[in-house]
Amino acid sequence: MLNIVIFGAPGSGKGTQSERIVEKYGINHISTGDVLRAEIKNGTELGKTAKGYIDQGQLIPDELMIDILASVFDSFKDSKGVIFDGFPRTIAQAEALKKMLAERGQDVSVMLDLEVPEDELMVRLIKRGKDSGRADDNEETIKKRLHVYHSQTSPLIDWYKNEKKYQHINGLGTMDGIFADICEAVDKL
């Protein structure tokens, strides 16, 4: 089973490239945001618990997030694989994901890191904000999001390098060129 973690700052193209990976390799996409919204909408026990944290303005604990991801992952048992988008974000989450997968005889196949320089991310996100009207894509908020991303991710990149799962992907260039680099990395697995 192909288990991919896709990684990159806001605006790096994770969503676009995830869609293409899903289409080419016939694997399922797990976006933590989408999964949380679905669990809450469907009124599952996990969703109700998560909603309680969200309603109180609290972060969802890693253990609960892993339980939710495990439930979704298990629903894909006949799948060729999964791409994890938006998770893990911390070393504790990466360790929890590794444990959850190991309990199922699986492991992360590769962590794809879409690297884009910060000045280009700003240009992309400001354009996206204008095009989509997303309130969280204004310059001040973007800078905060990028700071949080960089402060959380440096240790995680090193963690995946130590696990021998890290793959750098240059996130500059055409969508097709970036996707070709991703395919080259995935096809080697």
Swiss-Prot record:
It is found in: Cytoplasm. Belongs to the adenylate kinase family. Pathway: Purine metabolism; AMP biosynthesis via salvage pathway; AMP from ADP: step 1/1. The lineage of its organism: Bacteria, Pseudomonadati, Bacteroidota, Bacteroidia, Bacteroidales. SUPFAM superfamilies: P-loop containing nucleoside triphosphate hydrolases. The gene is adk. It catalyses: AMP + ATP = 2 ADP. The keyword Transcription regulation does not apply. This is Adenylate kinase. Its EC number is 2.7.4.3. Catalyzes the reversible transfer of the terminal phosphate group between ATP and AMP. Plays an important role in cellular energy homeostasis and in adenine nucleotide metabolism. Its main location: cytoplasm. One of its GO terms (cellular component) is cytosol. It is an enzyme of class 2 (transferase). Keywords: ATP-binding, Cytoplasm, Kinase, Nucleotide biosynthesis, Nucleotide-binding, Transferase. Consists of three domains, a large central CORE domain and two small peripheral domains, NMPbind and LID, which undergo movements during catalysis. The LID domain closes over the site of phosphoryl transfer upon ATP binding. Assembling and dissambling the active center during each catalytic cycle provides an effective means to prevent ATP hydrolysis. ATP binds at G11, S12, G13, K14, G15, T16, R128, G173. Residues 127-137 are annotated as: LID. PROSITE patterns: ADENYLATE_KINASE (PS00113). Monomer. Residues 31-60 are annotated as: NMP. GO terms for molecular function: adenylate kinase activity; ATP binding; nucleoside diphosphate kinase activity. AMP binds at T32, R37, Q58, L59, I60, G86, F87, P88, R89, Q93, R134, R145. One of its GO terms (biological process) is AMP salvage.
